[in-house]
A protein has these predicted regions:
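Charged, amphipathic alpha-helical stretches
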Residues: 3-36
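A short, ordered amphipathic alpha-helix with a cationic face
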Residues: 1, 10-14, 115-116, 128-129
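Intrinsically disordered, low-complexity regions enriched in serine, threonine, proline
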Residues: 7-10, 17, 60, 164, ...
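Short, charged, intrinsically disordered terminal tails
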Residues: 160, 164-178
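Acidic, low-complexity, intrinsically disordered interaction modules
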Residues: 30-155
Length: 178
C-alpha cells in the first residue's frame, strides 16, 4: 500500500471547525506572517467573492472565521498558521515533549538546527505528553512536526495517533484489522 504524505493542507482539512478557528486566529495575530497573511486575504476574497480591500478592513477575529471556513488552503498558509498556533498557545506542551526527548530548547523552540530525535525515546515522550495534555492538541502537534520536517521526525510515523492521520480515510491499520 502506498503511504499517503501528510501535508499542512491535509492536516488543515482534518481539523475540527473550532480547532481550525483557533489556528486561524493565531495566524492573524502573528506579526511575522505578513506575506502569508496577504496571500490569505486574497484567498478569502476570491473564495468568498469579496473585494480584497473589504477583507483587509476586517478585524482579526472575522478574518479568522473566514479563513477557518475554507476547507482547503495552500500548504504555505496552513503550515504558517499551525506554527503560529503552537507558538502562541502550546509552548508548555512543546517544551514538555522536547524535554522528554532530551532535546535542548528555549521555551519549546529547538535551539539547534537539523536536530533529529532519538527514535527510541519518542514512544515514552509521546506517552508522557498524552498524560499531561488534551489528546487533540497532542495529535495536532505531533502531526505538525511530521509535516514540517518529515525526515527528522520520521519516527513519529510509528506513533498510533500520528499513523492514523497518514492512512487514507476509511482504511484500517494492520493493528486495527487484527
Amino acid at each position: 500500500m502506498t503511504e499517503t504524505m501528510l501535508t499542512p493542507s491535509r492536516l488543515w482539512r482534518r481539523m475540527a471547525a473550532e480547532q481550525r478557528h483557533r489556528v486561524a486566529r493565531a495566524f492573524w495575530q502573528d506579526e511575522e506572517a505578513a506575506e502569508d497573511q496577504a496571500q490569505a486575504m486574497l484567498l478569502i476574497a476570491q473564495q468568498k467573492k469579496f473585494r480584497p480591500k473589504t477583507v483587509a478592513a476586517l478585524d482579526d477575529d472575522r478574518r479568522a472565521r473566514h479563513l477557518a471556513s475554507l476547507a482547503t488552503v495552500p500548504n504555505t498558509i496552513a503550515g504558517r498558521a499551525l506554527i503560529a498556533y503552537h507558538l502562541a498557545e502550546h509552548r508548555a506542551m512543546m517544551a514538555a515533549f522536547l524535554d522528554g526527548l532530551g532535546i535542548a530548547h528555549d521555551n519549546g523552540l529547538i535551539k539547534e538546527e537539523h536536530v533529529k530525535p532519538d527514535a527510541a525515546k519518542i514512544p515514552d515522550a509521546v506517552k508522557q505528553l498524552s498524560q499531561k495534555f488534551p489528546e487533540e492538541d497532542v495529535k495536532l502537534y505531533l502531526n505538525t512536526l511530521l509535516c514540517q520536517d518529515p525526515d527528522a521526525w520520521a519516527a513519529l510515523r510509528e506513533v498510533p495517533a500520528v499513523a492514523g492521520e497518514l492512512r487514507p480515510e476509511g482504511m484500517a491499520s494492520a493493528a486495527e484489522r487484527g
